[in-house]
Structure formats: C-alpha cells, structure tokens
Amino acid sequence: MAEGGGGSRRRAPALLEAARARYESLHISDDVFGESGPDSGGNPFYSTSAASRSSSAASSDDERERPAPPGTAPPSYAADPLELEEDETGGGWSAVLRDRPSPRFEDTGGPTRKMPPSASAVDFFQLFVPDNVLKNMVVQTNMYARKFQERFGSDGAWVEVTLAEMKAFLGYVISTSVSHCESVLSIWSGGFYSNRSLALVMSQARFEKILKYFHVVAFRSSQTTHGLYKVQPFLDSLQSGFDAAFRPSQTQVLHEPLIDEDPVFIATCTERELRKRKKRKFSLWVRQCSSTGFIIQIYVHLKEGGGPDGLDALKNKPQLHSMVARSLCRNAAGKNYIIFTGPSITSLNLFEEFEKQGIYCCGLLSSRKSDCTGLPPSMLTNPATPLARGQHQIRTKGNMSLICWYNKGHFRFLTNAYSPVQKGVIIKRRSGEIPCPLAVEAFAAHLSYICRYDDKYSKYFISHKPNKTWQQVFWFAISIAVNNAYILYKMSDAYHVKKYSRAQFGERLVRELLGLEDSSPAH
C-alpha cells in the first residue's frame, strides 16, 4: 500500500525553501500587471471558468475537514486487501512506488526576439497584428462595403477606409478595455466616459460607418463550411505570431480563461438590459504558459451549428474536452512539456496518448466530471476510515500515478510528469504547511499563478459587445494579443526605460494607434 502521513504541519525551513525555489520561474507573478488586488490564489484548486467554478466541489467529495486530535500524528489508512488485489490484477495498477525523474527540458523559454529599449506599445502589439494583417482588413472592409451597397443601395456618406483609419478604429475599440465602458460611442458622448483628445481623431459618424462595414473576411468561399470562416484567417495569423514571438516554459495549463461579463457592468445593468443580451455561442480554450501567463494557443468551439471537426455531434463533455486538448497540443509533441489540466480534460487514455507524443500531464480528477475509464475503482471512492489533513494514497501503472490526497476534502490527481516518491508541501498563510506528493504541490503552484493572472487579466478584456459571434471572437482574440504584448514588453529592455502598468500600457497603445503619441516609451 502507498500512503502518506500528515505529520506535523510545520516543516523544516530547508523543505520550505526548496518548495519556494522550485517555482522561482514564475518570475513576473503578482506584478504582471504592475498593480495588486484581490485574487483567487488562496485556493490552489480554483477553476478559472465560470462554469467550472460553479461546480468546483465536484473535484472534492468531502469538504468537511477531519483534523487529527491535538498532539497526535494523523491516522494511517489501510487499504482493504481485496481492493488492493482488484487494483493490481484488474487494470495493472500497483501500490509499489518507484522513483523516477521528471521529463527533461533543455529549451530556454521566453521572447524569441530582442526588442530595442525604444520599442513602443504598438511595436509589441504589431508582433501579433502587423500592418499586412491590418491592410487585409482594409481591403476586406472596402470590398464588403462595395458589395453591400450594390445589393442594398448606395451609401453616399461612405468613403473607403485607409490603413491609418483602421488602426484608429482598433484603437477606439481597444480603449474600452481600459475605460471598462461597454459602449465605445461614449468617447464622443460628452459624459463620464467621454475623451475629447481621442474624439478629435475621428468623428463618431465615421467610426460608426467603419463599424458597420468592418470585416476580416468579406465573403465565404465555395469550399468553406467552417462557422468561423469570417475570423479564422485572423486567428491563424495570430497563432503564427504567438509561435514566432515566444517560446513557452516547460509547464503549461489548458483551461477556459475568464471571459464572462464584467461584474461591475452586471451589477449596474437593469433587468431588461440583461434579458436583451444574448449568451455567447462559443467557448474559448487556451494553452497558457504557467511561468509567465503568455497564451500560447487559442481554440474556439462553436456551441451551435455543425462543423467539419464534428465536435457538435459529441454529447459527452469529457470526450469533447479531450478533442479540444488534442487540438491545443497539436504543436506540442516531442518537447517534454508538462501540461496541467482540469477535471473535464483529465483522463488515463488521453494522458497515455500524449505520453507517446512526448507530452506529459498532471491533472485534477473528478469521479463525476472526468473520464475515469481504466482507473481502479477503489481509488475513486472515499475510504471508510477518515483521513487526516495531508494524508494520501497512491497507485501506479507504468509512469502513471493516481493520487488521492486529503485537504478539507478528497482531491484526486492523475500524472505521469512527477515521481510518486517525491514529497512536496502546500504553504498556507494561516494553517501552516500541509504535506503532499510533489505532483500536488506543482499543480497548486502553477494553477494558483494562472488564477491570479486571470483575475487581473480578465479586467482588460475589450468591453465592446457586438452581436455577431465572429466579431465577439475577434475582439476576444485582440484582447489576448494585447495581454501577450504586455508580457513581452515586461520581459524586454523597453520596460526598464519606462515601467508601465497594464492599464498604462493599454492607454499608451490606444494613443499610438490613433497617432496621438510618439512611438518611443522614452518620451
């Protein structure tokens, strides 16, 4: 039997220092946005998606803490011999633990291009949205305007858009990520959200005309069946920019980022306004570097309508999420990445498939939300004997370890990235240190960082809410591009010339796109 005792909550200083040193690579951590605020870092198993957050208890089968009596060691848990025999003979799972090293990773993560100290906010943004992409938007928008007027009648007020106007148009919409005002037209309103310096660059009437005809892809080709055909070329271009500009660290996270409504807006919205709003028809998944927060890859899944990938025919959520994971990791093979996953993605079959490709995983497991095929049943049910905080059981099969760890509830993990023998510790400000396997410590550290990042980064999503799905996807993608640009800025020499917070960087980017600022952050 593999088991661990809770022991004293206070560990030796050397163990705590070693635990902290293991995650020094989370080097821009809380300061990633140059400001502090409340976050969700206190809960290492917090889920970043609203849907998952509402059912986060699914990952733990018992939220009641059962502490050991004061002054006594936590009770050991003895597995039933019949259960142990079933595990070993039924599916190849064993209670024998063997140490093994974590996957080697020799690549150097970070920006691939050294930006000069004089690089401006727009220089970083245009690593992902360069002029050739903007020029294509100009061509497609003008083409759509001509065809629209051929069909519905001439628009005497329309003049073909230029590259400078397209940049200004993007700048106006991006400004809503800083002002947190849902209506971009408020810039010209004269009210609280008005901005005279921005309003003078372009008239409201001209902005509304560009908004009316704005397109990334004007027309569907005869071979196109994808529901996102109007934005997919831009997503592909954005992905190429991400790949070219940044090399991720070894540890990464697959999840749904926070892209739900601004809680401040919801709190001030009338019931009628809320009823009029349409729910999103898509879900957005990302693969994210857990050391920096840089989003490496985006996957958009349409919730309605058919598609060539056949995802809409899938009714089983774990199966759907496994396909999403495969898509997000299609460029990750052979690099010994360690991918952290939530319960809906975690499964033995997927992890074994990824291991054959040189991708290793560590995932939170839920008997209700995960695909538990091939896992020993005795490890998926709570033991009859209460466990003390920090106690755990482990079963292994090849390189795979199934962990059941107790901390105010039973948490289960599946991993082939960490040795089942290596020990770790969860450091809590109030309750001290809680012993755990190294895989649990790693999961908590990296997921907590991503949660803190998302709590802050979600504040800077573009607030403009178009009705068309492809436009919603487009502006969410632009929001991600701006956040990624800020991360590259913080890792560059330009940050040491002028240290902008995330809000200041956004304001600077808007003014540069509108042509109101010099391109050098030194001025």
Swiss-Prot record:
Pfam families, per the entry: DDE_Tnp_1_7
Superkingdom as given in the UniProt entry: Eukaryota
Subcellular location field: Nucleus
Enzyme class of the recorded protein, top EC level: hydrolase
Keyword entries, A-Z: Endonuclease, Hydrolase, Nuclease, Nucleus, Phosphoprotein, Transposition
Bias-annotated ranges (Basic and acidic residues): 97-107
Record field: compositional bias (Low complexity): 47-59
A GO BP entry: non-replicative DNA transposition
Signal peptide: none
Tissue spec. comment: Expressed in the brain (at protein level).
InterPro entries associated with the record: PGBD, PGBD5
Modification Phosphoserine, positions: 520
Note: Has been domesticated very early in vertebrate evolution, approximately 500 million years ago, in the common ancestor of cephalochordates and vertebrates.
Protein task: Transposase that mediates sequence-specific genomic rearrangements.
PANTHER family xref list: PIGGYBAC TRANSPOSABLE ELEMENT-DERIVED PROTEIN 5
UniProt protein name: PiggyBac transposable element-derived protein 5
Gene name of the encoded protein: Pgbd5
